[in-house]
């Protein structure tokens, strides 16, 4: 396998870079940086870390993904998909555990790219992607209920699970702070209607500016102090991040490895999906393996500076494209804009109401929910609906790690079932039409099957799901012929169970004085059977290139 085909798009685009392209990238980068600001703060807080860590992630990961990535226009940073995972890790293992899990996920992503496995991600069934994306959306919405309504739990700890959260919400719903509810609803309305007036100015930024000013006035001049702001819960730091090496131990690595796999898989899916969507708009074609290496590098470096997991962000990538972003330079400028905000304007973030950020995340969860797609998938075959619903409910009730693992297992089982259903095993009893496709030599007459000969045709892969089906087909006939011809011209591959099945069949047939003859074996299957040693048992004289030769061989055996 060829490895390490690493070609960052930045370096190829700079060869013919012009002043006009730079000005276009500059404007796009500034706008994307402004769009990313409220999202980075909201994602950081919702994940259970301080707001500046969300911005640090957007800065470092955004810079690295643009510098090393395989897409011209991809914008990286924290996303809503990781909120649930990050929050769960911090609750159970603390921020040190989050650093370890993110580092391992970064290594896994790099390995996926190095060994050119980016295409494998595309084979994850769509119902699984929609199921866990919609499940994450519901979970994000659930985590924001307390801030939307300003609930007071009286020191009672909010459970981490979905059902536990709703139970405590209902128990304390009489503590609703209606000022918080008004702030959240107003924020949602502003975000929803802003695109009608301006496509370029992000609604989330307008909502934060308008609502923050309004709440500041209410607190300062009307004496309303019941609306919590970021400054009421966090100490805002306005300084450049410094690297810190985490303490690693084997027990933590073992415990967090499944979570790291989830982060890597989710990050790979979201980043490649974002890059694919961008390709559809720009007409470009991204390098998925280079993109995965860049994503992995970002997740390897970002946590050392206190950041959280990052990936390609569809909304910010589309904002980049729509505002004229042409090359990775736009993504680098977006990171620089955020760095300047962190260094010089971060203290202003303390005045942002928590209820306003909750409103921002409600819109994020709505956009993530893909409810129209979810509804459409419910009309698909029952197997797809089963995968969709199981992944969805497991994501909500348990966690994303379990949802992805179980969803993939179920999808594999259903896939094998479909292959079994499409693979046909037929019995040809009397004669074979000479016009019957490929492996018959030129012949004008029908090929007569002699008495004492059975011809079986397998149409499809010969793997462990089909072996039993073949045995059942032979058992139904109940005959004991002298020769069994197995026509394998339409068998694309055979696995170990298929080889074992053929070996068992051959040994059993030899005991019953029945000869097995193979016909029309393709080159790939031929090499597999030869390498396994099966031909030594069968006898090379019983391997025939087509059905004509196989029938002649059968006549020799009978006579």
Where does each model-flagged region fall?
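Transmembrane helical cores of multi-pass ion-transport proteins
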Residues: 1-429, 434, 513, 533
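Short, contiguous clusters of charged residues that form electrostatic/catalytic patches at enzyme active sites
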Residues: 28, 188, 192, 468, ...
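Active-site-adjacent beta-strand anchor residues
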Residues: 76, 131, 518-519, 544
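Generic hydrophobic alpha-helical segments
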Residues: 86, 166, 470-474, 550, ...
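Residue-level detector of flexible, active-site-proximal loop/helix-junction positions
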Residues: 135, 152, 462, 525, ...
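Short secondary-structure capping/turn micro-motifs that flank functional sites
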Residues: 336, 525-526, 545
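The feature marks cytosolic C-terminal regulatory regions of anion transporters and related permeases
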Residues: 367-537, 555-558
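Short acidic-hydrophobic, aromatic-tinged amphipathic segments that line or gate anion-handling sites
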Residues: 537-553
